[in-house]
C-alpha cells in the first residue's frame, strides 16, 4: 500500500505518521530506505495528538500487518472515522467509532464471490480470517451498531477488484442495516462507494 510513498517524498518533504511497528517495517523496504529519519513521526495507539487544529485519535485494529491502526479525526466538533484493513470488530471497535459525523469503512469482499473465485485457498482463508478484511455483510452489521441521527455520510472503501462489485457492496450494506435490530433503514443515510482510481466528491459534515 505504501510503495509510492518514496516517489511522493522526492517531490515534497512531508511528515509520515505511523505506528512504531509500521515505521520499522517501512525502513526495511528498499524503496523507502532513502527517507530521512526525521520525517517519521511515531503514533501510539490510544494516544491522541494534533496536526494544526485537527485532533487525531489512533486505535488498534485486527489485521495481519505491522501494527496497523485505524484513525478518528476531529475538527470544529466534527468527527470523521477511517476504518479499513480489519478482519473483525468487537465492542471496543464499535465504541470507538460511535458518534462519527462521517465514516470511511471497509467493505472488502462478497463472501460468495471470494469463495468461488480464483484466489488460492490460503489467501481466501487469510481474507476471511479475523486478521483479514471485512466482508460487505460485516460492514453493514458494524454500521448498524454505530448509526445515529447525526451521521452525515457513509463511504464504503477498500473494495476488492476481484471479489466485489460497487453495486453489490452498496445493496448488501443497505440490506444488513435494514435487517438489523435498529430503528434505522438502509436508505436513511447517504451511502456512497469510493472509486479505486478516481477522487471522491467533496463531502461536508
Predicted regions and their residues:
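Di-metal (Zn2+ and/or Mg2+/Mn2+) metal-binding site signature of metallo-dependent hydrolases
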Residues: 1-12
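Core dinuclear metal-dependent hydrolase active-site scaffold
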Residues: 3, 44-102, 202-205
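Short internal beta-strands
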Residues: 14-23
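Active-site metal-binding loops of divalent metal-dependent hydrolases
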Residues: 21-22, 61-64, 84-88, 107-109, ...
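Short, charged/polar "capping" segments at the starts of alpha-helices
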Residues: 22-28, 201-202
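Short acidic-hydrophobic, aromatic-tinged amphipathic segments that line or gate anion-handling sites
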Residues: 40-45, 193-194
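Cap/insert and terminal regions of metallo-dependent hydrolase folds
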Residues: 91-192
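Short, basic/aromatic-enriched C-terminal tail that caps enzymatic domains
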Residues: 189-205
Amino acid at each position: 500500500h505504501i510503495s509510492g510513498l518514496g516517489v511522493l517524498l522526492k517531490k515534497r518533504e512531508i511528515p509520515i505518521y505511523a505506528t512504531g511497528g509500521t515505521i520499522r517495517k517501512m525502513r526495511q523496504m528498499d524503496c523507502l530506505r532513502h527517507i530521512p529519519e526525521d520525517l517519521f513521526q511515531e503514533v501510539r495507539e490510544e494516544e491522541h495528538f494534533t496536526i494544526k487544529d485537527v485532533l487525531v485519535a489512533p486505535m488498534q485494529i485486527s489485521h495481519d500487518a505491522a501494527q496497523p491502526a485505524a484513525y478518528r479525526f476531529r475538527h470544529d466538533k466534527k468527527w470523521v472515522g477511517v476504518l479499513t484493513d480489519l478482519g473483525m470488530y468487537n465492542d471496543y471497535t464499535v465504541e470507538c467509532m460511535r458518534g462519527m459525523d462521517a465514516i470511511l469503512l471497509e467493505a472488502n469482499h462478497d463472501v460468495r464471490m471470494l469463495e468461488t473465485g480464483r484466489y488460492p485457498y490460503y489467501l481466501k482463508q487469510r481474507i476471511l480470517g479475523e486478521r483479514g478484511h471485512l466482508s460487505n455483510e460485516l460492514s453493514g452489521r458494524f454500521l448498524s451498531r454505530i448509526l445515529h441521527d447525526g451521521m452525515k455520510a457513509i463511504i464504503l472503501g477498500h473494495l476488492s477488484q476481484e471479489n466485489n462489485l460497487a453495486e453489490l457492496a452498496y445493496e448488501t450494506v443497505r440490506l444488513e442495516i435494514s435487517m438489523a435490530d435498529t430503528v434505522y433503514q438502509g436508505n436513511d443515510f447517504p451511502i456512497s462507494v469510493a472509486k479505486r482510481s478516481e477522487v471522491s466528491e467533496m463531502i461536508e459534515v
